[in-house]
Regions:
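C-terminal subdomains that position terminal phosphate/3'-OH groups for nucleotidyl transfer/ligation
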Residues: 226-366, 378, 390, 396
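Glycine- and acidic
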Residues: 31-37, 69, 174, 253-258, ...
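Alpha-helical phosphate/pyrophosphate-handling elements in metalloenzyme active cores
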Residues: 34-65
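Glycine-/proline-rich flexible loop or hinge segments
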Residues: 25-40, 67-72, 87-90
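C-terminal functional modules
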Residues: 372-376, 380
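Sequence-structural signature of the catalytic-core scaffold of metal-dependent phosphohydrolases
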Residues: 1, 15-21, 25, 50-51, ...
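Alpha-helical scaffolds flanking conserved acidic
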Residues: 8-9, 59-72, 126-135, 181-182, ...
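N-terminal amphipathic/basic leader segments beginning at the initiator methionine
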Residues: 1-9
Length: 396
């Protein structure tokens, strides 16, 4: 079974799979082709792991488990970031949908060719139960998530139907409760991309921090943050923006000089340190000095910190993500993935050998899942190469 002989001292050594290497060519917010400076899913994951390890060390959790969870958290993301995720969710609707976090679990426990069971069944990396549980960000099946403030059910989920057995073994009847290591991973992810996506946006000239003193721009950012992340407290977000604008190193008029680049990097480091410290202090105040492992407690995020993280994420939404959703490349990216799925349905022999082997053993619904697995495994660049080889010119 998963976890036999897979001690924590070996976890990082296990995590050199092709799925991790491929993250270097997958979109974070800006595509990897944008600039050498811009973060990819791989560099983002390394930064998340660093933050996660700091949280674990300070709170008495197993740092190897948390770090491995952080390195793993984006393995399931397809080409073209969230745009690609939405496209694959559409084409995979008849076989249970697509969700990057459910795909991550599938890679770790099935798809990554590292270990097999005594009967020859693929078991992925054969990680420990604690490590796999720490990767489960959404511990529920499709349609069974928590109810949101507007009364709808969260569209996120952590497992596909055909992976339910291993999911049940991992979760051991815990319901929707998350272990503290998974909470640390999730928070480390939030901290990393809230800070670093803004840093990337400023350096690339997509975020002009000087306009944020305009009350109309402030209202726009707060409204986008509230709408995108479902937050109701606009006043708290406004206060968070005021605090960020008061930072001495805030890049008010960024022109890319050495001094300004250094100041932006220092600001990122200061914000990350502040967020980690505030969370550790609040969590220790609530639960004592630890150690905090598995289900011994919850990570406590002070409201000020939560608002500042959300506001930074909102800046990336307003000035990077929303404008790019109307760009022609977004439609082109979706077309690439739609075309690839269609082409592989028509010609499954074009699948990589291990995917074709899995395809032959499945029924119709299962075969579509295998094709989606194949397409999701591609990088931004290899998706285009496959499209050129299998489909030719982009259709209108």
């Amino acid at each position: 079974m998963h976890g036999v002989g897979a001690g924590n001292s070996r976890l990082r050594a296990q995590l050199v799979p092709q799925a991790l290497r491929r993250l270097g060519e997958k979109t974070q917010v800006l595509g990897p082709e944008s600039d050498d400076f811009i973060r990819t899913r791989l560099t983002h994951s390394l930064e998340v792991a660093q933050i996660g390890r700091a949280l674990a060390t300070n709170l008495g959790a197993d740092p190897d488990v948390v770090e491995t969870s952080c390195l793993s958290h984006d393995l399931g993301h397809p080409p073209y970031g969230h745009n690609g995720e939405r496209a694959l969710a559409e084409v995979a609707e008849s076989c249970g949908g697509f969700e990057g976090n459910a795909q991550t679990l599938r890679i770790l426990t099935r798809l990554e060719p590292k270990r097999t069971s005594p009967g020859g069944r693929p078991v992925g990396l054969n990680l420990t139960r604690a490590t796999l549980d720490a990767v489960v960000k959404y511990p529920w099946e499709p349609g069974r998530g928590p109810t949101r403030p507007d009364g709808s059910t969260s569209p996120k989920f952590g497992v596909y139907d055909e992976d339910r057995d291993v999911f049940s073994w991992i979760r051991a009847g815990r319901g929707a409760e998350r272990c503290i290591e998974a909470q640390m991973m999730d928070l480390a992810d939030d901290i990393a991309y809230s800070v670093h996506d803004v840093e990337d946006g400023v350096v690339r000239g997509l975020i002009d921090a000087s306009v944020l003193w305009d009350p109309a721009e402030q209202e726009r950012v707060v409204a986008d943050t509230t709408a995108w992340y479902g937050l109701a407290d606009g006043a708290a977000l406004g206060d968070a923006l005021d605090r960020l604008l008061g930072e001495e190193a805030w890049p008010a008029h960024f022109e890319g000089t050495y001094t300004q680049l250094a100041a932006v990097k220092d600001l990122s480091s200061d914000l990350i340190g502040r967020f980690v410290s505030s969370v550790c202090e609040a969590t220790i105040a609530a639960h004592g000095p630890g150690p905090l492992r598995r289900y011994a407690g919850d990570v406590v995020v002070p409201e000020r910190t939560r608002a500042e993280i959300a506001l930074l994420k909102g800046l990336a939404v307003t000035y990077v993500m929303l404008p790019r959703e109307s760009e022609p490349r977004y439609y082109e990216q979706r077309t690439v993935l739609f075309d690839l799925v269609d082409a592989l349905v028509e010609n499954p022999r074009a699948l990589e050998p291990h995917f074709f082997e899995a395809w032959k053993a499945r029924d119709e619904s299962g075969r579509l899942r295998v094709i989606v697995d194949q397409v999701a495994s591609l990088t931004d660049q290899s998706a285009r190469q496959w499209h050129s080889r299998l489909c030719g010119f982009l259709r209108n």
